[in-house]
Amino acid sequence: MADGFATAPQDFKGVFTPEIEAQTAPVWEKVKHHVTPMEWRVQAPLIVEINRLKREKNAAILAHNYMTPDIFHGVGDFVGDSLALAKEAAKSDAQIIVQAGVHFMAETSKVLSPEKKILIPDLKAGCSLASSITGADVRLIKQRYPGVPVVTYVNTTADVKAETDICCTSANAVQVVEWAAKEWGTDKVILIPDEFLARNVARQTDVKIIAWAGHCEVHKRFTAQDIADMRAAWPGAEVLAHPECPAEILEAADFAGSTAAMNDYVAAKKPAQVVLITECSMASNVQAESPATQFIGPCNMCPHMKRITLQNIYDALVHEQYEVTVDAEVLDRARLAVQRMIDLPPPAVPARYDLVKARHHVDVELI
């Protein structure tokens, strides 16, 4: 939940001076392909003021991979996926954390940093996947499948994590599922709430998967025809897909893996042309670090992530508003599930999904 009363926002009226232009020049070099010069005259003073407020208030901003480039490159102290950001928040000396992401991410940061003030710039920044399941749903699932370990994707609320045996990310889901099956001495595991992630994991393991019909609205919209059209238009482009996409997308891709794995792939392989089958801003942000690579659509935009702006980040810092809290009992149990995952030996590299590996039978039971 989030506490506090919002103060009516008053747009920051900064002036684009030569000093601000010089100070923000390195950021401009990274965002200039995605931000117009006119937009930059508004954004640059905001970036300078937000960074000043961070120093004044001992605050840090966690910028998710799906943030717009002005946020990601301009004010993000830590950038990456939701779990990586929460872990960085826990290590940071900052007393105030502003979550430039959606609400479940702010909850995860609170779970790992209960002593810190966690702010979210917009209370309406939700998530279709996280809202697809509740803690009460998980309790009913456990009654239906007694003794079967519950593995929960980190893209869930603290209430759901609290009912979970261990959490996972898209990068380590196969590893966590196989660990849970071995630890519980069973051949089946409940993997919730993303149905497509569960089905894609099932293709990588012999463990039987019990899944929930939750979906990310961004990745669900992609179709195999999208990829076919892109290959026809750009025959040399390499296609990288996120495992929250339907299996037909992964089958049509050249590579599938987490956002971290995609980033590493582009950095290592340096493809001339690449298509990232994920949220739009991911390509925009990776492009700044890989200028020689041409990034081609399609992409789908997350309306929830895009609720976060420089202006409401500024408002959150100025007024220290929209603090995210988690009930103490829920927090302790949720932290146990996340910590179990963190304590597992990390893979040497972010996991990729083997698109060649053929399973004679993929056993997925949909709840």
From Swiss-Prot:
Family note: Belongs to the quinolinate synthase family. Type 2 subfamily.
Cofactors demanded by this protein: [4Fe-4S] cluster
A molecular function (GO) term: metal ion binding
Function: Catalyzes the condensation of iminoaspartate with dihydroxyacetone phosphate to form quinolinate.
Cellular component GO terms, alphabetical: cytosol
Pathway listed: Cofactor biosynthesis; NAD(+) biosynthesis; quinolinate from iminoaspartate: step 1/1
Organism the protein comes from: Caulobacter vibrioides (strain NA1000 / CB15N)
Binding site for [4Fe-4S] cluster: C127, C216, C302
Pfam families per record: NadA
UniProt keyword annotations, A-Z: 4Fe-4S, Cytoplasm, Iron, Iron-sulfur, Metal-binding, Pyridine nucleotide biosynthesis, Transferase
Catalytic activity as recorded in UniProt: iminosuccinate + dihydroxyacetone phosphate = quinolinate + phosphate + 2 H2O + H(+)
Name of the featured protein: Quinolinate synthase
NCBIfam families (alphabetical): nadA, PRK09375.1-2, PRK09375.1-4
Residues binding iminosuccinate, per UniProt: H64, S82, Y153, V154, N155, S170, H242, P243, E244, T259
Protein's GO biological process: 'de novo' NAD biosynthetic process from L-aspartate
Cofactor note: Binds 1 [4Fe-4S] cluster per subunit.
